[in-house]
Design a protein with these regions (language model features):
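Core subunits and conserved enzymes of cellular information-processing
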Residues: 1-356
Length: 356
């Protein structure tokens, strides 16, 4: 056995259960434990952090299962990126793995974990050195500034490793995968907050963060446009939720016949969405990474992927792969042909990426 194979086959990992099937109670316990730890990690701020240039990307933090400014600021980004890179290399034949054997699967998982660790280190360094998560500006040019940078990188690396192993815990001991769980947790928290929060918006002291309180407020003062926007957001959320539950429950029966037993056949039920939401998660995380990299490159004076004006992408690749609020534009009466073109490109990219 070569040194490389020895490293791959002896990487630290979460031990799987000894029994073949875990009880529902056992899986629920580990899933809830991982969820609680995830929320606690999101409340631990990075020590030595000054300027948090990423805090404006709230939507991206939900997709990446991250909490910018906390120890899990990297989220699932490195894990997803490593998985995408390895699948592309394996699918194109550049790197070949025999996934039909146990050893081949172990090598594939080992390389995938190494790539995830590499991207954890790489993204931690980039986030700090390119100004996304930087130490206080008053320490710039001092030895303390460099030390705080190293400390921030270490904290991000530690948080990324914890999420990596928590993903393994959920995959082996809980329900589904950690990636799906962390994203679902962030989405659920965001939906609850944006629907019911009575806290005033920091951008508009007269408005509420929650859609329901803001809908009531806008109706009482006769603000039809805001009321329409809030109502559209609530109805769209309910419609998507109902549609997702219905489609997820759909099954397609595949007829099977047996050559050795003439006249005998069965129907094998398969989920209509056989791959679940994993392809969508991977593409969404990829696009989120593009937007993050575009912002970091712009901060570094190299807007190779495009530029932002505030929180809005206004040029380059990032402008075309950013989601468009078409419904909001229609309600406001500001819909343009450019908005439709951008939305079409975004949808096409999402569909093609998910299928591939």
């Amino acid at each position: 056995m070569s040194a490389w194979e020895s490293i791959l086959l002896n990487l630290p990992e979460v031990a799987g259960p000894t029994q073949k099937h875990l009880s529902f109670k056992e899986k629920l316990k580990w899933t809830l434990l991982a969820l609680v730890v995830f929320f606690i990690l999101g409340l631990i701020p990075l020590f030595g952090l000054g300027d948090n240039a990423l805090q404006q990307f709230e939507f991206l933090s939900i997709i990446l299962g991250a909490e910018f400014g906390s120890i899990i600021s990297l989220g699932i980004g490195p894990i997803v990126t490593g998985s995408i890179v390895l699948q592309l290399l394996n699918g194109s034949g550049i790197v070949k793995f025999d996934l039909t054997t146990h050893e081949g699967k172990r090598r594939f998982q080992g390389v995938q974990k190494l790539l995830a660790i590499f991207f954890i280190v790489f993204e931690a360094i980039i986030f700090v050195t390119m100004g996304g998560l930087a130490p206080p500006a008053e320490f710039a040019g001092t030895a303390l500034f460099a030390q705080l940078r190293l400390l921030l990188i270490f904290q991000l690396f530690l948080g990324g490793l914890i999420l990596l192993f928590m993903d393994e815990v959920v995959s082996k001991w809980g329900f589904g995968s950690g990636i799906s769980l962390f994203i679902a947790a962030g989405v659920s928290e965001s939906i609850f907050t944006r629907a019911f929060s009575w806290i005033k918006s920091p951008n508009n002291p007269d408005a509420y963060i929650g859609a329901i309180p803001e809908l009531v407020r806008s109706l009482t003062i006769g603000d039809a446009i805001t009321a329409g926007l809030m109502l559209a957001a609530l109805l769209a959320t309910i419609a998507v939720f109902v549609m997702a539950v219905y489609i997820q429950a759909m099954k397609i029966e595949i007829p099977l016949s047996f050559g050795r037993v003439k006249g005998y056949g069965i129907r094998w039920p398969l989920n209509f969405i056989y791959t679940s939401n994993i392809p969508v998660i991977l593409v969404a995380a990829l696009l989120a990474n593009v937007q993050l990299w575009a912002r970091l490159l712009q901060n570094a004076g190299r807007p190779w992927l495009g530029t932002f004006s505030g929180n809005t992408p206004i040029s380059g690749l990032v402008e075309w792969v950013a989601p468009q609020n078409i419904v909001g534009s229609v309600i406001r009466g500001s819909l343009t042909g450019s908005d439709i073109a951008h939305a079409a490109v975004y949808i096409l990219f999402f569909i093609v990426g998910s299928v591939i």
